Amino acid sequence: MSASSASASSPKPGPFTPLDFQLVLLRRMADHNPDLVEEARHQLGVSIADMREANRRWQAMTRSPRARGSASRYRSVLGPPALTVPRRIGDLECEALLWPVPLWPTLRFEVLLAPNGAAWNEWLVRTPGTPGPELHTLDDLTPWSCTVDEAARAFAPARPMEGTAPTRWRLVLTAPDGSGQPRRCVAEFTWGLLQRVSFPDGA
């Protein structure tokens, strides 16, 4: 069989689905929490190969010279947003688009749009109207327990740091440990969801 005929007989990949997008979220989180990702993967009924293929296709979509803008890409993959919320940031009138994420029922995937339609932020947030976690001490900062905004509010003032990748965020904050002693730490997030807490200065 010639290469051309083999190519012609190869099935074309199906559309990129909301399930595929959840695998993209998980793929980045596997660097810090492989056990949680493994559990989630089994819950979704997919293989490691499925997760890798979804991530490969997503990277190809985002890096293609013909790539759509972020908002259009998310609409094509996730469908119309379940909720559109006006958001004022300083003097700017912005818009937040939110989609459900079945793997995390109390979270939504949010794309924050600037007035010109450009995507400023793309991350997981708590569903509007849903109570967030009780965050009082370092013991409460467990993987996948909270979002960037929730940690920043609970342990204000928190200082944002540059993330180690486009989908990662870091906050420097001070929180009491189990004995009530304040400790300075760095909370690391992927796609807006807490992954781990580190103590770079040995505090």
Task: Walk through the language-model features, giving the residues of each.
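Amphipathic alpha-helical segments
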Residues: R68-L83, T142-M161
